[in-house]
Amino acid sequence: MKKTSLRIKRVLLLVVLLLIIGVITTLIYYKSSLGKVSTSTTDKEIVIKKGSSTKTIAQTLKKYSLIKNEFTFLVYIKLNNVNDLKYGTYLMKENMGVEKIVNMLQEGSTYNPDEVTITFQEGINMREIANIISKNTTNSYEDVINKANDIEYIKKLKEKYWFITDRLDNSNLYYKLEGYLYPNTYKLANKEVSVEYIFDKMLAEMEKHLEEYKDFDYNNMEIHDYLSLASMVEKESPVSKDRSKMAAVFLNRKAKGMNLGSDVTARYANKIDDKSKALTAREFAMKSPYNTRLQDGSMNGRLPIGPISTISKSSIDAVFNKDEHNYLYFISNIKTQETFFYENYSDFLTKKQELASVNQGF
């Protein structure tokens, strides 16, 4: 009787041990099944259709090797009371694991397979902007140029943005929105978005960078003048550290009634985008309210009629926080990107002759 009782106890103990081992093994397997399939970081595009059941979602994830086991995925969903998985197109990786995948499915997809990323560099003009947009969207070059000069559109912008003023009504401006579109990388919903949609994004970004200067004491200048100056500084200065000093040079010359003498404004006036092309004497003398190289006195003490390129935050800050000095001239070594500043013309001319061979063609 005692032997039978002992035998029963041993059997029961064995059963309990086996159950414990089974539970532990199951838990280990379950936890392992929830882990990442591999260490791969390659994106996989999957589509969860509207109305898909949890089982169908599990099958889709397994098909793309994003989960190890459909059953454990379903168990995880049940145990965690998940019932709000969202449909859509997702980018997922094999190294995510079930928890991250479920979190993503609960949050919903932010991935758009039709999304277009478009980049506008600092210091480019409206013609170059038009080329970039026409190459990356369904809009034509002409669509962009026309929108940049659209009077009705400009009227709407005046109501929306404090920095869009009546100065843009000037018919002599090549492109009314030149210099007002902030250079950056933008994400577009698709290639079919309108030029106005793109411009609105760029203008909203410009507003962010100008906001701190909304109540600036402009004295006898306006925001349009500061943007014109900033675009000159953007194009003239190889490095940002020289820009506030360079801005002061132009304003010093303006205060003395001199022409501002900026080569980049002459290049813009002639609509020459080839940076390797040296300007001729005739091009430097082109009669234009953009050309600050004119020697006939018509541009003495005057900024160009408007901005000549996109403008970085560095150049914006430089003109609003210009240095205080007496320099009237500067010249840069194109190769080393070092800029030299002078108070008198003879010293400037000496350095210019010294750098003539280095800067040939610029």
Language-model regions, residue ranges each:
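A broad, low-specificity signal for short, low-complexity segments enriched in glycine/proline
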Residues: L6-R10, K49-T54, K277, S288-N291, ...
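Signal peptide-directed extracytoplasmic domains
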Residues: Y30-M206
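Short N-terminal secondary-structure initiator segments
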Residues: L19-I24, T41-T56, F120-M126, K158, ...
